[in-house]
């Protein structure tokens, strides 16, 4: 692999995470003669490899987290070695060689987390030491002579040892900036050396037994000390010496015994972080409000109550985090909510009763933790906060405007909706600081003046153009304008805004930015765009634009360079011309741009045009593993690689096989099949054939690709198999050197998609780690991928391809390992599977509110308005503002009923009995049962369209000229024949299963279609959702009984029926309801059927007429009583108040209070709120709605004239709930302005918990039915 010739140019490489156990180490490292830094962390090394001796220029060596017991070997022979990092090993004192401290340049030594019992011998000879870390060992003493020579130390970490004292020579460390002594028993150490360390910036003394007596009295000389940690000690108050630190920024005093704070804390004017958790504080002094730069304040686990927090805490305008968990707080000061930058507020485990109402105006808040406060009641959210719900403006004025209301109506609604002043307005004003308000006012004034000036200039230009003679020709540059094309991807906002040189190279039809290191180097087969930005004599920006044509460049590159150069000029608004420069014939002005120092390089990028050639596919086989997101592991291309517990994918280019083992899961098989579909769609243009194979049923072609069928397919993959962790390298290229650092993606986060509050370490690769301007190498052990960013330099790409080959051959890999190249935007599916949630779909944030859109950077003027319009979610609330559907008059309904029945030529009924449809007896017409299915075949007469009257008269005259019967017969033959139409109505009870519809579809429907070809229409209906034309055939005598038509007769119970008309007399039904006297209503008629046990008299049927019922309905009730119920029952019509006690009230189950009016019938409306159209929309159900119109996955709004009920189904999404709540509020506000005498109240109803005021709006309310098959 040395043929690539790149190893001598490698200056740094990170080989961490590879397995170098057992004495193996890649010999190719010796060829990296220019290596400056080398990382071998977590590689399993037990001793230093001999190959290090060849790295004579090595300066930094890191061998952390290994199994090293000694550093003896080649280290002392590396003359340039500056840094040795050997933390987290098993080093003892005998394993640290003395001769390494004789290296002249050794300045960094990290031997932390080892087994040292004393300081390494000869350490004092390392006179140039700058960083020394001996923490987490067992060192008990520090020799006095150590710090006699190490006077240049900048960083010293001796934490987590057994030190009881410190040498006095430490006072010589006048350059020391960081001192860490955590976890040492320094009870008797007075730390008198500290005042002498004048350069100290960080001092950590956590858990060092500090008290008031063993700290220096003053640290006034430490003017640079900014970070102090005195946590986990025995301090009862803040040490006086801390008040003398002028530059203190971070102070940790947690886990002490501090009971109070001094008023002197106002001297910490620069403090940004103050941690006082786990102390005994009962109050904070008011002086803490003077810490104007404080950003983080931690007060957890103290004894603070409401009086202990100063009322002026709102003066901390820079406060971002406030934590006071596990205290005795019942309230928090209202001023705390005036901290405009507060992001994190933690108040859990307190005794909170409520929070200030201004808590809702903390716009930057990300974390609000109030858990374990059992008596907490959150304050109500402020009303009328428009445009904050999923970027939809729910204000009444805006929704009326969208619904097409007139401006007068909108203005009237605005006037009616403007009530008293918002009590929260004052808190909102208090939240804004005085200085920011002045800045905003100044900006508004400047903006207003600018707008006025621009408008004035525009009018002057228009008037000047109007006065100019029409024959005058405008100059070419006066017509320049920015192109409408989107060039932001190629030319960034700062292009041409700073003096300097910018160069683009044409690649695949588009300009790609060239790094500054490669300016002046031109490929002979390429074209370039050169932009020179400079300041003219007046101090204004000016530009020169050239496009350079290579001698071997193709036509497409020449054309694109000229086009993009012109668009760049228009993009900048420049008045200069674009100058063409050809290779070998450059102008003097062009050469001066590069100081006459340009060079030509052979070669160039490929043409942007497609070349027709056959694609070569490499046959590979992968083992599929993983549960939630599958991954593919390459395996050798032979039959013995198969395992019956897994699914394998064999990729042969245009033939893809998915092999399922006998013990593989169906889920893995399905996911592997989907994975193959993605490969076919994205990489094979849909031309590949995917074949699913099951173990034991393989095709000969499958075994041919694997070199033959094995004798037996065995289990050979270990149960705990998991492939090595992928390693992501970033290729770095400088002047004459290459670097290959690893990206520690274990600590990476999805910073582009996830909010800050959810930033947690993820041990997965993320797509956001890949920068389009860079090149990366992804080492997956059995696969090495080279990812090329679209804007990456060409030389970096070439170097990466060679480095990938070297890296593949450098380590022990299986024979089937390959190196593949992936271009940004055309990545292979196998490469994408290595990343977490690789997403090719454009991300759209539907939760962004209007304020977030307005704060989008880089938006101004019309662009800003366009962005707002684009980001707004569509919502349709028009139905809320339409008037209620007026009821149909009785005369109109009867006329319509008469017309439909005149057209009816005949009707036959069928009912499902068992598995067949039987003919329905005529005496049962109009009777329906909730558990049955019915079919009605209706034959309608279709009127004949006769010819015009004149032609008809002519025909009659001609007919008169003929004689007798012959003329009459001829006239009759010419008359058009009457036509007919057949409609089959299928009616299904709400308790019937769907088997009735399936039975009808496959039996009766086919028979009807054969009898009436081309003239049959099928209408499917469910109970109480019938077609009005169908209802008209029963002439308002439509009775729905509960149960089945031929149910097993047992002890009969009384049954109660309600007659009700919904919106029109056509929609009149008599439906059986629960036998309960509380369901009676004075405005309706009811029928009560009471059976007797006597054989002579079957029972009695009462028609109960309410005192306020409609007379027409009373007549209808009497008619139904007499004609539709069994003649064996005696019948009686009774008025309300005249009920017989013996049979009526006994039969109905005792007398109970019931409603005496149905005023709600005049106002009831039902709306549906849904996202099924792809956006939020509200639609209104017709006035003849029923219980089954309540969709379980949507929100329903029911208005009864007094209350608006928001009904929530069990499968409703949270998005619909939030949007429907705002829509409901808009509707109530609209009705308040429209019917101010009937103000509505909002009520929430969940499915299954409906109250009587809600259910009475529905005819024959009963328990919800479960979904039936």
UniProtKB/Swiss-Prot annotation:
<feature type="modified residue" description="Phosphoserine">
    <location>
        <position position="406"/>
    </location>
</feature>
<feature type="repeat" description="Gelsolin-like 1">
    <location>
        <begin position="509"/>
        <end position="591"/>
    </location>
</feature>
<comment type="subunit">
    <text>Interacts with actin, ACTL6A, NCOA2 and CARM1. Interacts with LRRFIP1, LRRFIP2 and MYD88. Upon LPS stimulation, LRRFIP2 competes for MYD88-binding. LRRFIP1 constitutively blocks the interaction with MyD88, even in the absence of LPS. Interacts with the nuclear receptors ESR1 and THRB. Interacts with SGK3. Interacts (via the gelsolin-like region) with TMOD1. Interacts with (via the gelsolin-like region) TMOD3. Interacts with LMOD2, VCL, GSN and DES.</text>
</comment>
<feature type="region of interest" description="Interaction with ACTL6A">
    <location>
        <begin position="495"/>
        <end position="827"/>
    </location>
</feature>
<keyword id="KW-0539">Nucleus</keyword>
<dbReference type="GO" id="GO:0005634">
    <property type="term" value="C:nucleus"/>
</dbReference>
<keyword id="KW-0225">Disease variant</keyword>
<feature type="compositionally biased region" description="Basic and acidic residues">
    <location>
        <begin position="453"/>
        <end position="465"/>
    </location>
</feature>
<keyword id="KW-0009">Actin-binding</keyword>
<keyword id="KW-0804">Transcription</keyword>
<dbReference type="GO" id="GO:0030239">
    <property type="term" value="P:myofibril assembly"/>
</dbReference>
<feature type="repeat" description="LRR 3">
    <location>
        <begin position="56"/>
        <end position="78"/>
    </location>
</feature>
<dbReference type="Pfam" id="PF23598">
    <property type="entry name" value="LRR_14"/>
</dbReference>
<keyword id="KW-0597">Phosphoprotein</keyword>
<keyword id="KW-0206">Cytoskeleton</keyword>
<feature type="modified residue" description="Phosphoserine; by SGK3">
    <location>
        <position position="436"/>
    </location>
</feature>
<dbReference type="Pfam" id="PF13855">
    <property type="entry name" value="LRR_8"/>
</dbReference>
<keyword id="KW-0965">Cell junction</keyword>
<protein>
    <recommendedName>
        <fullName>Protein flightless-1 homolog</fullName>
    </recommendedName>
</protein>
<dbReference type="InterPro" id="IPR032675">
    <property type="entry name" value="LRR_dom_sf"/>
</dbReference>
<feature type="repeat" description="LRR 2">
    <location>
        <begin position="33"/>
        <end position="55"/>
    </location>
</feature>
<feature type="repeat" description="LRR 4">
    <location>
        <begin position="80"/>
        <end position="103"/>
    </location>
</feature>
<dbReference type="GO" id="GO:0008154">
    <property type="term" value="P:actin polymerization or depolymerization"/>
</dbReference>
<comment type="function">
    <text>Is a regulator of actin polymerization, required for proper myofibril organization and regulation of the length of sarcomeric thin filaments. It also plays a role in the assembly of cardiomyocyte cell adhesion complexes. Regulates cytoskeletal rearrangements involved in cytokinesis and cell migration, by inhibiting Rac1-dependent paxillin phosphorylation. May play a role as coactivator in transcriptional activation by hormone-activated nuclear receptors (NR) and acts in cooperation with NCOA2 and CARM1. Involved in estrogen hormone signaling.</text>
</comment>
<feature type="region of interest" description="Disordered">
    <location>
        <begin position="951"/>
        <end position="975"/>
    </location>
</feature>
<dbReference type="InterPro" id="IPR007122">
    <property type="entry name" value="Villin/Gelsolin"/>
</dbReference>
<feature type="repeat" description="LRR 13">
    <location>
        <begin position="293"/>
        <end position="316"/>
    </location>
</feature>
<dbReference type="GO" id="GO:0005903">
    <property type="term" value="C:brush border"/>
</dbReference>
<dbReference type="Pfam" id="PF00560">
    <property type="entry name" value="LRR_1"/>
</dbReference>
<feature type="repeat" description="LRR 8">
    <location>
        <begin position="175"/>
        <end position="196"/>
    </location>
</feature>
<feature type="region of interest" description="Interaction with LRRFIP1 and LRRFIP2">
    <location>
        <begin position="1"/>
        <end position="427"/>
    </location>
</feature>
<feature type="repeat" description="LRR 11">
    <location>
        <begin position="247"/>
        <end position="268"/>
    </location>
</feature>
<dbReference type="GO" id="GO:0051014">
    <property type="term" value="P:actin filament severing"/>
</dbReference>
<dbReference type="GO" id="GO:0045214">
    <property type="term" value="P:sarcomere organization"/>
</dbReference>
<feature type="modified residue" description="Phosphoserine">
    <location>
        <position position="860"/>
    </location>
</feature>
<dbReference type="Pfam" id="PF00626">
    <property type="entry name" value="Gelsolin"/>
</dbReference>
<feature type="repeat" description="LRR 10">
    <location>
        <begin position="223"/>
        <end position="245"/>
    </location>
</feature>
<feature type="modified residue" description="Phosphothreonine; by SGK3">
    <location>
        <position position="818"/>
    </location>
</feature>
<keyword id="KW-0677">Repeat</keyword>
<dbReference type="InterPro" id="IPR003591">
    <property type="entry name" value="Leu-rich_rpt_typical-subtyp"/>
</dbReference>
<dbReference type="InterPro" id="IPR029006">
    <property type="entry name" value="ADF-H/Gelsolin-like_dom_sf"/>
</dbReference>
<feature type="modified residue" description="Phosphoserine">
    <location>
        <position position="856"/>
    </location>
</feature>
């Amino acid at each position: 692999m040395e043929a690539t010739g790149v190893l001598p140019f490698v200056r740094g490489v990170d080989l961490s995470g590879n397995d170098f156990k057992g004495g193996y180490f890649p010999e190719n490292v010796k060829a990296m003669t220019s290596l400056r830094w080398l990382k071998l962390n977590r590689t399993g090394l037990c001793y230093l490899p001999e190959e290090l001796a060849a790295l004579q220029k090595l300066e930094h060596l890191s061998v952390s987290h290994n199994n090293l017991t000694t550093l003896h070997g080649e280290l002392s022979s590396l003359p340039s070695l500056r840094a040795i990092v050997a933390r987290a090993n098993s080093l003892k004192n005998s394993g640290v060689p003395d001769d390494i401290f004789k290296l002249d340049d050794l300045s960094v030594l990290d031997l932390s987390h080892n087994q040292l019992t004393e300081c390494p011998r000869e350490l004092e000879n390392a006179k140039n030491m700058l960083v020394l870390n001996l923490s987490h060992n067992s060192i008990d003493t520090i020799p006095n002579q150590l710090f006699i020579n190490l006077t240049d130390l900048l960083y010293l970490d001796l934490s987590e040892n057994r030190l009881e004292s410190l040498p006095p020579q430490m006072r010589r460390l006048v350059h020391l900036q960081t001192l860490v002594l955590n976890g040492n028993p320094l009870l008797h150490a007075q730390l008198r050396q500290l005042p002498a360390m004048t350069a100290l910036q960080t001092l950590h003394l956590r858990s060092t037994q500090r008290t008031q007596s063993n700290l220096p009295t003053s640290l006034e000389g430490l003017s640079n000390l900014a970070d102090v940690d005195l946590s986990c000690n025995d301090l009862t108050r803040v040490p006086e010496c801390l008040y003398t630190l002028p530059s203190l920024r971070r102070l940790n005093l947690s886990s002490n015994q501090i009971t109070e704070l001094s008023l002197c804390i106002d001297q910490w004017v620069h403090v940004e972080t103050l941690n006082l958790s786990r102390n005994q504080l009962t109050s904070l002094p008011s002086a803490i409000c003077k810490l104007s730069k404080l950003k983080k304040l931690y007060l957890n686990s103290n004894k603070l109550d409401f009086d202990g927090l100063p009322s002026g805490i709102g003066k901390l305008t820079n406060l971002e985090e406030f934590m006071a968990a596990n205290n005795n707080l019942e309230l928090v000061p209202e001023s705390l909510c005036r901290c405009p930058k507060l992001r994190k507020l933690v108040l859990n485990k307190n005794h909170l009763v409520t929070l200030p109402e201004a808590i809702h105006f903390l716009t930057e808040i990300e974390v609000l933790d109030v858990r374990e406060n059992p008596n907490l009641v959150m304050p109500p959210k402020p009303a009328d906060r428009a445009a904050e719900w999923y970027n939809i403006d729910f204000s009444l004025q805006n929704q009326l405007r969208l619904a097409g209301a007139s401006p007068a109506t909108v203005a009237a609604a605005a006037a009616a909706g403007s009530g008293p002043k918002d009590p929260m307005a004052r808190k909102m004003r208090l939240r804004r600081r005085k200085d920011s308000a002045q800045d905003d006012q100044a900006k508004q004034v400047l903006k207003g003046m600018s707008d006025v000036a621009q408008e004035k200039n525009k009018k002057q230009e228009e008037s000047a153009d109007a006065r100019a003679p029409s024959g005058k020709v405008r100059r070419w540059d006066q017509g320049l304008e920015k192109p409408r094309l989107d060039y932001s991807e190629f030319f960034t906002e700062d292009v041409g805004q700073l003096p300097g040189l910018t160069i683009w190279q044409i690649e695949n039809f588009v300009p790609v930015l060239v790094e500054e290191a490669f300016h002046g180097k031109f490929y002979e087969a390429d074209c370039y765009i050169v932009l020179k930005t400079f300041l003219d004599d007046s101090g204004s920006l000016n530009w020169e634009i050239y496009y350079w044509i290579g001698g071997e460049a193709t036509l497409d590159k020449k054309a694109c360079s000229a086009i993009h150069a012109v668009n760049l000029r228009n993009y900048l608004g420049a008045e200069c011309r674009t100058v063409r420069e050809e290779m070998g014939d450059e102008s003097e002005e062009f050469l001066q741009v590069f100081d006459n120092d340009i060079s030509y390089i052979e070669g160039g990028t490929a043409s942007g045009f497609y070349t027709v050639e056959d694609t070569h596919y490499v046959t590979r086989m992968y083992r599929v593993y993983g549960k939630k997101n599958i991954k593919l592991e390459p395996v050798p291309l032979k039959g013995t690689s198969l395992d019956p517990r897994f699914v394998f994918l064999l990729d042969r280019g245009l033939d893809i096989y998915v092999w399922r083992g006998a013990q593989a899961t169906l889920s893995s098989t399905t996911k592997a099949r989907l994975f193959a579909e993605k490969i076919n769609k994205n990489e094979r243009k849909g031309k590949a054939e995917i074949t699913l194979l099951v173990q034991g049923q393989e095709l000969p072609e499958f075994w041919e690709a694997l070199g033959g069928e094995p004798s037996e397919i065995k289990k050979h993959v270990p149960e705990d198999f998991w492939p090595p962790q992928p390693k992501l390298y970033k290729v770095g290229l400088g002047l004459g050197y290459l670097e290959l650092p690893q990206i520690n993606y274990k600590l990476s986060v999805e910073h582009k998609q996830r909010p800050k509050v959810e930033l947690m370490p993820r041990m997965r690769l993320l797509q956001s780690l890949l920068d389009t301007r860079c090149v990366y190498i992804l080492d997956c052990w059995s696969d090495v991928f080279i990812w090329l960013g679209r804007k990456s330099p060409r030389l970096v790409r070439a170097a990466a391809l060679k480095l990938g080959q070297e890296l593949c051959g450098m380590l022990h890999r299986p024979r089937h390992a390959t190196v593949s190249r992936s271009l940004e935007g055309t990545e292979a599916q196998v490469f994408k599977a290595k990343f977490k949630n690789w997403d090719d779909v454009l991300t759209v944030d539907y939760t962004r509110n209007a304020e977030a859109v307005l704060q989008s950077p880089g938006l101004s003027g019309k662009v800003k308005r366009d962005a707002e319009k684009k980001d707004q979610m569509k919502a349709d609330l028009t139905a809320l503002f339409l008037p209620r559907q007026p009821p149909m008059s009785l005369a109109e309904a009867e006329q319509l009923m008469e017309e439909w029945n005149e057209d009816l030529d005949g009707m036959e009924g069928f009912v499902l009995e068992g598995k067949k449809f039987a003919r329905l007896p005529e005496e049962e017409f109009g009777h329906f049962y909730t558990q049955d299915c019915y079919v009605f075949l209706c034959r309608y007469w279709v009127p004949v369209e006769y010819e015009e009257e004149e032609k008809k008269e002519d025909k009659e005259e001609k007919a008169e000229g003929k004689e007798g019967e012959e003329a009459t017969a001829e006239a009759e033959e010419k008359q058009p024949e009457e036509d007919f139409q057949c409609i089959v109505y299928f009616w299904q009870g709400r308790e019937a299963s769907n088997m009735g519809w399936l039975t009808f579809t496959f039996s009766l429907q086919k028979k009807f279609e054969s009898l009436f070809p081309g003239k049959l229409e099928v209408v499917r209906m469910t109970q109480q959702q019938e077609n009005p034309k169908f209802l008209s055939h029963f002439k308002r005598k439509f009775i729905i009984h509960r149960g089945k038509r031929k149910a097993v007769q047992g002890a009969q119970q009384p049954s109660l029926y309600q007659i009700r008309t919904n919106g029109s007399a056509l929609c009149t039904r008599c439906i059986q309801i629960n036998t309960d006297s509380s369901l009676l209503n004075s405005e309706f008629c009811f029928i009560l059927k009471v059976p007797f046990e006597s054989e002579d008299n079957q029972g009695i049927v009462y028609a109960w007429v309410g005192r306020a019922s409609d007379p027409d309905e009373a007549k209808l009730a009497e008619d139904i009583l007499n004609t539709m119920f069994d003649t064996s029952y005696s019948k009686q019509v009774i008025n309300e108040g005249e009920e017989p006690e013996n049979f009526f009230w006994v039969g109905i189950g005792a007398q109970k209070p019931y409603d005496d009016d149905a005023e709600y019938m005049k106002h009831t409306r039902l709306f549906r709120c849904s996202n099924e159209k792809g956006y939020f929309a509200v639609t209104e159900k017709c006035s003849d709605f029923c219980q089954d119109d309540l969709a379980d996955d949507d929100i329903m709004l029911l208005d009864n004239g007094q209350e608006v009920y928001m009904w929530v189904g069990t499968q409703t999404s949270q998005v619909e709930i939030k949007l429907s709540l705002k829509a409901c509020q808009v509707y109530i506000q609209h009705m308040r302005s429209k019917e101010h005498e009937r103000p509505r109240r909002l009520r929430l109803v969940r499915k299954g918990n409906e109250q009587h005021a809600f259910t009475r709006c529905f005819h024959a309310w009963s328990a919800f039915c479960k979904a039936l098959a």
